[in-house]
Design a protein with these regions (language model features):
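Mid-domain catalytic core of redox enzymes
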Residues: 255-353
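A conserved FAD-binding loop/helix module that cradles the flavin
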Residues: 54, 440-466
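C-terminal segments that line or cap access tunnels to active or ligand-binding sites in enzymes
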Residues: 314-403
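N-terminal glycine-rich phosphate/pyrophosphate-binding loop and immediately adjacent elements
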Residues: 2-142
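Extreme N-terminal leader/targeting segments of oxidoreductases
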Residues: 1-4, 23, 417, 467-470
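Active-site/ligand-binding neighborhood in enzyme catalytic cores
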Residues: 133-244, 409-416
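A glycine-rich dinucleotide-binding beta-alpha-beta segment and adjacent secondary-structure elements
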Residues: 188-200, 384-444
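A conserved beta-strand/loop element that lines the FAD pocket in flavoprotein oxidoreductases
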Residues: 241-254
C-alpha cells in the first residue's frame, strides 16, 4: 500500500483518488478551498440555484466507467442523469435563423438544418461530421484513452481531419476549423459549427479542423444533464471517494512538492507541516503553486495555459414560469460573439413553478466582455427577458480565480490533434519520478469527460507503471 498525496479536489483529481484507493493505496486529497468539485460549483439565492461551471455533460461513458470501476453502485443509481432533447437551439438573428436540433439523431439534425438553411445543408453537415468521425476514430485512443507517449507531439501534431483540399493556401498547410467550415459548409451554417467549438474556449480561426470532433461527440453521444445541477455529479464523485476511504484535507494549501533522493516524497503545506507520500498527483494548474515550489525550472512548468480564456457568466432569476416549449440549451450567434443560454427544466433550480433560473455564459472576448453585452444577446433566446428579470448575479474570470485558484479564471479546453501539437496538454508523467499530473491542465485536457479520463490514466500509470497502455 503506497501513500498518495493528491493536490486539489477537482473532478480529475477526485477521479484519480477514487481509482487509486480501489487499487489499495492510501490516498489523501489536499484542497486549498473549503469544498470539492473545482470549477463544478453551485450558487443559491432566494430559492434559485445555478451551476457556476459546466452545465451539461458530454461523453457520460467516462463517469459511468469510473463508477463501475470503483464500487458496486453504477452512476445512474447515484445521480438522476437525463439526456437533453432537443439537444440545442441555434439563434442567428443577423441571418433571421432560429433552428432547434434534436439530440443524438444524425437524420433528425439533417432534416432540421435543411429546413432552416436550405437544400443541401443537412447533407453538407453530415459530410463534415462524417469526416470528423474519421478524425475521432484515428485519435480516440492516443488522444483520450492512452497516456501521452514520447513522440506523441509529433504523431498527433498532424491534423487527422480529412479536409477537402482545394487550390491555393490550403495546399500549403492544413485548414483551420474556420477555413474548413467556410469551404465545406459555407455561410450561416459554418457559424453553427464554429460556434459549437467556440463554446469550449477554442478559437475557430486558429484551431485545427480536427476540432470538429467536439460537435461530432455531442451529436453522437448526446448532451446530458444531472437533475439538481451538475454539482450533484461532483457530490457523487466525492461520496464515492469517501466510500473508498479517501481522506480529504480542506483549507490545506500546498506550498511545495517535496523531492528527496530524486523522486517526489510529499508536500509542504502552507502551515509549515509536511505530508509524506510515496507519490504525488498534481490535480491543479501548476501555476497555482508558488514560484519555485515545483521540482523543475519555472520556464519548464507544464500547462502554462497561455492564451486560455475565461468565462463571463450571468445568473438570472426570472419571474414567470418556464415555457413548456423552452429548449434547455440555446446558442446565440452574433458577428464576432456568441453566448450560451441554459434553461434547465429542473424544479431544484427554482423556488416554485412560477419562476425560472437561467444561466448565460460566454468565453470572454470582444462583444462578450461586459454583462450588458451578454444580456443583450440572451434576449434573443428568452422572450421578455428584461421584463421578467428579478435580479441577477455576475461571475467574472476574477471570481472564478478567487473560488478555484485557476490563474486568470482560465478554463482549459480539451486537447486536440493537429496545429503542430500546440493544442495538446502535458503528459501525465513528469521528469520527476513519483510526480504525476491530472485534471484539465494535463493530458487529455479540460472539460468534464477529458478531465475525468485523467483519473484512469494516472491511476493506471501508478498501479501498472510505465508499461500501462491505456484505459480499456
Amino acid at each position: 500500500m503506497a501513500r498518495i498525496a493528491v493536490i486539489g479536489a477537482g473532478m480529475g483529481a477526485m477521479a484519480t483518488a477514487a481509482r487509486l484507493a480501489v487499487a489499495g493505496h492510501r490516498v489523501t486529497v489536499y484542497e486549498r478551498g473549503t469544498t470539492y468539485g473545482g470549477a463544478v460549483g453551485r450558487y443559491e439565492r432566494e430559492g434559485f440555484a445555478f451551476d457556476t461551471g459546466p452545465g451539461l455533460l458530454h461523453l457520460p461513458a467516462v463517469y459511468r466507467d469510473l463508477f463501475v470501476k470503483t464500487g458496486k453502485r453504477p452512476l445512474e443509481t447515484c445521480v438522476d442523469m437525463v439526456q437533453v432533447n432537443p439537444a440545442v437551439r441555434h439563434v442567428l438573428p443577423h441571418h433571421g435563423i432560429d433552428v432547434t436540433l434534436p439530440g443524438a439523431s444524425h437524420g433528425g439534425v439533417a432534416t432540421a438544418l435543411e429546413s432552416a438553411f436550405g437544400a443541401g445543408a443537412g447533407e453538407r453537415w453530415n459530410a463534415v461530421l462524417g469526416r470528423a468521425r474519421d478524425a475521432w476514430d484515428a485519435t480516440r485512443r492516443p488522444l483520450l484513452e492512452e497516456p501521452l507517449r514520447p513522440g506523441a507531439r509529433q504523431s498527433l501534431g498532424g491534423d487527422p481531419y480529412p479536409a477537402l483540399r482545394r487550390s491555393g493556401l490550403l495546399r500549403r498547410r492544413p485548414p483551420t476549423l474556420a477555413e474548413m467550415a467556410d469551404r465545406e459548409l459555407g455561410g450561416a451554417l459554418a457559424e453553427v459549427l464554429t460556434g459549437l467549438v467556440g463554446e469550449y474556449g477554442i478559437d475557430p480561426a486558429t484551431a485545427p479542423a480536427s476540432a470538429a470532433v467536439l460537435p461530432y461527440m455531442e451529436q453522437t453521444f448526446g448532451s446530458w444533464y444531472v437533475r439538481g445541477g451538475m454539482r450533484a455529479l461532483a457530490t457523487a464523485v466525492y461520496e464515492r471517494c469517501l466510500e473508498r476511504k479517501v481522506a480529504f484535507a480542506f483549507g490545506a494549501e500546498v506550498r511545495e512538492v517535496l523531492v528527496r533522493d530524486g523522486r517526489a516524497a510529499g508536500l509542504l503545506l502552507a502551515d509549515g507541516s509536511e505530508a509524506a507520500a510515496d507519490a504525488v498527483v498534481c490535480g491543479i494548474d501548476p501555476r497555482q503553486l508558488p514560484a519555485g515550489s515545483l521540482p523543475w525550472p519555472p520556464e519548464a512548468v507544464p500547462a502554462r495555459g497561455d492564451g486560455v480564456p475565461g468565462r463571463l457568466t450571468l445568473l438570472l432569476a426570472l419571474r414567470g414560469a418556464r415555457p413548456a416549449t423552452a429548449v434547455h440549451r440555446t446558442v446565440v450567434h452574433a458577428p464576432g460573439a456568441r453566448v450560451t443560454v441554459l434553461r434547465p427544466d429542473d424544479p431544484a433550480t427554482r423556488p416554485d413553478e412560477e419562476h425560472e433560473a437561467v444561466t448565460v455564459s460566454a468565453v470572454t472576448g470582444p462583444g462578450t466582455s461586459e454583462p450588458a453585452e451578454l444580456l443583450n444577446l440572451a434576449e434573443k433566446a428568452v422572450q421578455g427577458l428584461r421584463e421578467r428579470l428579478l435580479w441577477h448575479e455576475v461571475r467574472t474570470p476574477a471570481d472564478i480565480e478567487a473560488a478555484t485558484g485557476a490563474v486568470g479564471g482560465a478554463v482549459p479546453p480539451p486537447a486536440l490533434a493537429g496545429a503542430g501539437g500546440r493544442m495538446l496538454r502535458p503528459a501525465n508523467t513528469t521528469a520527476v519520478p513519483g510526480l504525476y499530473l491530472a485534471g484539465g491542465w494535463a493530458h487529455p485536457g479540460g472539460g468534464l469527460p477529458h478531465a475525468g479520463m485523467t483519473g484512469a490514466l494516472v491511476a493506471g500509470l501508478i498501479v501498472e507503471g510505465a508499461e500501462f497502455r491505456g484505459s480499456r
